[in-house]
Structures are given as structure tokens and as C-alpha cells.
Amino acid sequence: MEQQLWRQGCSFVVGVDEAGRGPLAGPVVAAAAVLPRDGTGLPSIIRLDDSKKMTEEEREAAFEALEAASRDFERTGVAFAFCVLPPSLVDEVNILEATMLAMDRAVQELSEKLRGGGQGGTEGSSPGALPLAVLVDGNRLPPRLLAAQQQQQQQQTSESSKFLARAVVKGDAKITAIAAASVVAKVTRDRLMRAAAEKWPRYGFDTHKGYGTTAHVAAIRKYGPCEIHRRSFEPIKSLVGWTRGEMGSEE
């Protein structure tokens, strides 16, 4: 699919994915990534795949290689951006809306980087203004991307402003750029959860990364939720009697 889009005139094929929709604690992270057409800018990456199929060591190695390559975008054609949204926002708007917002923001930041040759660009500019294709893992597009796609379809625009946004089910196993975004999102979030484990060691965030394991749920029941637990997720919701609009404070 990526090769076909390049042949159709897209300058960049952006892959988008998220990490952290299901956990009981921690942020949701979305990432957007672009890779070179021929892969020559990624000599040290042996494997890019759906991050869930990779070991932690493989993900870290891939992330380090992506990060190193992105420092010389003009030579490598590698760039990425990510957005981290806190659990308080997840509780405020719900996890789906938070995920969509994070994806929109990651794409926005990356599009600004691409305008600036990988170093940043015009703040607030629309992702639809670049000749690019945005491929999102899953079955729906974030609102801003959907609006840009609809606007593109309604207007008879020139080739230079070509824009396409598409949701791709299981895209992290089909599209290399989505796989790269998957790695960036997962590694970024895992690192944040390991840091959280140092602040709240009794929950074991460094091992389960906030997911609802038996040990994690037992710790929540024993100690109560901490600052980064999602009050809108069960069993925390029932434990604290949370309802949307009542953002509880730490005791």
C-alpha cells in the first residue's frame, strides 16, 4: 500500500498508532511516523513489526534506531512525533476520545516537522496542506484527520495539495510506517510507566505497565488507587465511587 501511495504522488506516508487504551493506569500515547521509501535510512533496524509481537529489547532497539535516524531527516527520511495524554484527561473525556485526540496531535506535530525539514514548522497548520497520506491503525479516523479528508474530497484541489487519510485494520502488521509508530508509542509509554514505578513502587508498574493483572488489581484493592490510576475504569470506578465530572483529588 505504501509503494502504491508514493506512486500516486504522495510525498510522505505517515503511519499512526497508539499505546495504552486498555490499562488501568498511566497515560495514553499516540505516535506518527514516516520512513524512507527504500528503507536505506534504517540500516540498524533488523525488524519492525506490530510492537505487541516484539520483545521489549527489540522494541527498545528499534526505537533507538528510529530516534538516531530522525536526527538527520534530510539524509534518512525518518521522522516521528508523539503525544502523551494523562489519565485525568482519559477520565474527563473517555478513553476513545482521548486516543483520537492524541492521534490528531501526533499527526499535527509530525506534519509541522515535515514542513521544516524534520526540525519543526508552522504551528497550527492543517495536516491536509501537505501532499501526504496518513494511515491510522484501527477502524476509524481521528476527527481532525476525518475533517481534512472530507474537505479534500469536497474540493477540486491540485496535485500539490494531495491528501489522503485512511484507517487500516491491523495496520501495524501491514504498514511499515504504522509499525514504526507502534514502536514509538509503546516504548514511550513503557518508559513513562517504569518511571512511575519508582514513584509508586507498590503497584508494580514496571512489570505490567498499568494493565489489569491479578497482582495489579490486588494492589489497588489493598492500597487504593494512586494519582495515575484511571478513575473511569473498573474496578477503580466502583472502589472510589467515581462518576464523570467528579475528578477526585488524591488523599
Please report, for each region that a protein language model flagged, where it lies by residue.
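RNase H-like, Mg2+-dependent phosphodiesterase core
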Residues: 1-251
